[in-house]
Curated annotation (Swiss-Prot):
It comes from the Eukaryota. This is Frontoxin IV. Belongs to the three-finger toxin family. Ancestral subfamily. Disulfide bonds join 3-24, 6-11, 17-41, 45-57, 58-63. Keywords: Acetylcholine receptor inhibiting toxin, Disulfide bond, Ion channel impairing toxin, Neurotoxin, Postsynaptic neurotoxin, Secreted, Toxin. Produces peripheral paralysis by blocking neuromuscular transmission at the postsynaptic site. Binds to the muscular nicotinic acetylcholine receptor (nAChR). It is found in: Secreted. Expressed by the venom gland.
Length: 64
């Protein structure tokens, strides 16, 4: 499984996920200046926190 890893809306960078981390995720939030994006691989979908504007979890290569 590969997941995108860059903190931009358009993302070309991917990484192979370690064994057991078969979920790609993307979190978005605003830091009062711009929209921030975090992407990567996880074993379990992270929790949506109050400051997040969106949370995506998926199980296909580069789906985040």
């Amino acid at each position: 499984m590969t997941c995108k890893t860059c903190p931009f809306e358009t993302c070309a960078n991917s990484e192979y996920c370690p064994a057991g981390n078969d979920i790609c995720y993307q979190k978005k939030w605003n830091d009062h200046r711009e929209e921030m994006i975090e992407r990567g691989c996880v074993a379990n979908c992270p929790q949506m926190e109050s400051h997040h504007t969106s949370l995506l979890c998926c199980r296909r290569d580069n789906c985040n």
